[in-house]
């Protein structure tokens, strides 16, 4: 009798596992099919892309990539994108870590209200304030400047960085380390840069990855503030090749791959730090 109960329980578990595996396969297919379609289309002629959208190319046309490279001025657009992204990431790391440390160690009503104010930046979409941002950038004479996009992206992404740094510091860094630094005569800045900052490497890695993905994929702010093609980013070059009535997908998709490939490589090599950084500060104690 007991054996029958055990066997029926095992069968139920097997059915659940099969159901979960089937769901995972379906989710993987939903994710993979568009990527597959994007990749194979980059090597097709326009006629073949229309006749056989998901088929393997009969003739692999590698010239599509060289044409896209020239048409979108990829080195210039790539350089602009890297400059904007790297500068924004550095500024967010500096400001976010210092603000997160200050809020983590300031146990006052004012500190709590400031933290709630920063959290509001996570809740309210920046698109709601885009008109105000446009007027501010124009009044500062930063139109058509990469620094306009950098400053706006810093303002958009800093609240999330502050939240991650604050929670990580509270969860993992004991006050005894800072008290020992105080005894050794360290000031606030020296204590932060010598003691606290080296311990923030896991969460810094997480913030770097998240902010890089956000800034690299940001399209609205470059579209508004970078009007000349010389200062444009990769996504702007891609959008310029989308026609109002028709689009050559075999020319557009290689541009998309050129723009996405560096980000995919970066994410593949850095994704383990996301889990490590988030889980380290997830549980206090």
Can you annotate each of these PLM segments?
Residues 1:
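Charged, structured surface patches that assemble and position nucleic-acid processing machinery
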